[in-house]
Structure formats: structure tokens, C-alpha cells
Amino acid sequence: MFNMINLLDLSLEDLKKWMIENKEKEFRAKQVLDWVYKGVYNFEAMKNIPKVITNKLQENFYLSVPSVVQKYVSKDESTVKFLFKYNDGNIIESVVMKYKHGNTICVSTQVGCKMGCTFCASTIGGIVRSLSHGEILGQVLKAQEETGERISNIVMMGSGEPLDNYDNSLNFIRMVNAENGLNIGQRHITLSTCGIVPKIRQLAEENLQITLAISLHAPNDNIRRKTMPIASVYSVEELIEACNYYINKTNRRITFEYALVSNLNDKEVHAEELATLLKGMLCHVNLIPVNKIDEKDFKSSSTNRIKNFSNILLKSGIQTTIRREMGSDINAACGQLRRRYVKNNSKEV
């Protein structure tokens, strides 16, 4: 099977081309993918596909979504956390968050992460490998199957750095956005990055209308370098310049993610410095109480300090929200469940 291709890694155009090359009508490609997006992963169960075609498909492709290793539902049932396993045994996490306006899934783009952000559990142990776009898509399809509900929004904020897996991340976006795919609007898709400056500029040229989220977490280089190794490669000034380039190219508002760590980046002077840094930008700041990680000693800011930080930004004209905490009772923060699973098993999976 591992010498064959997962059909989920093919776009409609790819499959049309394959059909033509194999002397079949190209409309069969859409019929096959229609079944796939309905959750049918057995070629023989595709009732309107002739046997001669299903035989060819079985000889060249396999259809696989990840299996569920563990599933956790929060007490209020607003959050469902999945540990998914791929065919090679690697484990990743996905989280479904249920809102009044629809269901959002947080997907992983890599197994582990090499970026080394110190407040993120996903990066402990480094990166194992990147996921193909079909493997990322499989998270969405499996989550829909497990919850019995449609996913209407996607955030690429799970383990991994999407821009370090650039081609697969963009192919995934285009596949879920396609009318013949999940038909999720680009403005309902958010890509989060720690700030790989050249890739942000490259993304600006892609003619996409997705939301770009930047993990900023500090108003200056000195603080940012303490928690994010990427800050030693690209300065805050370079990052903001790339963000302004992205805004000018796409006319899309950028979200800046800011995890508040007690006595590190949460003082009034930091809020004022951040307000100055972002003044005049088409942007929004999302303040995040930092998550507790067993291996780390970070402490979240107090509720009062978070509110005060928010008020300073708001008074400076910076659109600001405080992230609603969801799934805290099931360790739904990025990387925590996978890390615990790996620690409790004698062999890395």
C-alpha cells in the first residue's frame, strides 16, 4: 500500500488527468470524489462507478483517513479533541470547537514541530515529519464522520508550522475551498504562523482571501527571542514589514496572537509598546492566557492584568479580543494530549 498514492492527495484536476490517461471518461473523477467527500472510502462501495474503473483505482490508489486513537469531549460538549493515528503510526491532534455560528476544526500540518516556541507543547521533541495535504484533509473528513456534523471553519493552528510545509498547506486550502470539495469559503480558513518572513511575502502573492494569524507574543525583539527562536532569524521590524506587505497585497486584516505570560510580556509598558508597534495597521489582536505545560514553568497572567492589557490596546484604537477558553478540562491546547500520549508509551509513535 505504501507504494501507492492516497487518493486524498489528488485534486479533481489530478484525478481527471488520471482518468483520461487510463482511457476513462473524465467526469468519473468528480463522481469518485463525490463519494469520498460523503465519507465513502471503499472504491467498491461507489455504486455509480463501473467495476473496470474501481479495479484500476484499487491497483493505483488507496483511500485512507486517520484512525481515532483517543477522543475526548469537554464537559460542556463544546469541544471534541481527537488523537489521530496515520498508517505509519504517527500521532497528531485535531480539535473541533462548536459555536452557534458553526463548527471549527483546528488541524495539524506536521507531526511535531521544529520551531521551538517555548510555550508550545507541540515543539517538545521536535519534528517527525510534515503531513501531505491529503493527510491534513483526512483530519477534517474523519472529524465530520465522528461528530456527524459539518465543519464550516478551519484554523491551521495545530501542531506544526504551516509555512514550513508550504505547498501541502496551500494545496489543502485549495482542496477544502473547492466547490467539488468541502466548499469552505477562504474567509472561513485561518492559517497561523510563527513568522517566517519570506513565506509571508510569498503567501501574499497567492491571491487567497484566507485570514493570516501571526504568533507575535511580544512587542520587541528582546522579549520575543526569549520564547521564540524564529525571532533570532527575523526581527519584529522585519515581521511587521512583511505583514504590511501582505495587507497591501490582499486587503485582508491580519490577526496577531499574543499569549500573555505573567511578568514576561504582560505589563502596561508592553501593552503600550504593542499599541505603538501596530498603530495604523489593518489588524486585530487576540490575547491568549498561556496554557500550562508540564515541562514548562510559565504562569498565565491574572484575569485583571489581561483585561488591563486589553483596555490599553482598545483605547489606542487596536481591535482586541480575549480568547475564550474552550476544552481546558481535556487539555485541548495544542500538543498537550499528543505529548502525554507519547510520554505514556514506551516507544515514540
Swiss-Prot record:
Domain Radical SAM core, chain residue ranges per copy: 99-329
A Pfam family: Radical_SAM
SUPFAM superfamilies: Radical SAM enzymes
Catalytic activity: adenosine(2503) in 23S rRNA + 2 reduced [2Fe-2S]-[ferredoxin] + 2 S-adenosyl-L-methionine = 2-methyladenosine(2503) in 23S rRNA + 5'-deoxyadenosine + L-methionine + 2 oxidized [2Fe-2S]-[ferredoxin] + S-adenosyl-L-homocysteine; adenosine(37) in tRNA + 2 reduced [2Fe-2S]-[ferredoxin] + 2 S-adenosyl-L-methionine = 2-methyladenosine(37) in tRNA + 5'-deoxyadenosine + L-methionine + 2 oxidized [2Fe-2S]-[ferredoxin] + S-adenosyl-L-homocysteine
SS bonds (residue pairs): C106-C334
Cofactor note: Binds 1 [4Fe-4S] cluster. The cluster is coordinated with 3 cysteines and an exchangeable S-adenosyl-L-methionine.
InterPro entries membership: Aldolase_TIM (IPR013785), Methyltransferase_A (IPR040072), RlmN_N (IPR048641), RNA_MTrfase_RlmN (IPR027492), rRNA_lsu_MTrfase_RlmN/Cfr (IPR004383), rSAM (IPR007197)
Keywords: 4Fe-4S, Cytoplasm, Disulfide bond, Iron, Iron-sulfur, Metal-binding, Methyltransferase, rRNA processing, S-adenosyl-L-methionine, Transferase, tRNA processing
Main location (coarse class): cytoplasm
GO biological process: rRNA base methylation; tRNA methylation
Record localization: Cytoplasm
GO molecular function, one term: rRNA binding
Family (UniProt): Belongs to the radical SAM superfamily. RlmN family.
Additional comment: Reaction proceeds by a ping-pong mechanism involving intermediate methylation of a conserved cysteine residue.
Protein name in the entry: Probable dual-specificity RNA methyltransferase RlmN
UniProt source species: Clostridium tetani (strain Massachusetts / E88)
Lineage: Bacteria, Bacillati, Bacillota, Clostridia, Eubacteriales
Primary gene name: rlmN
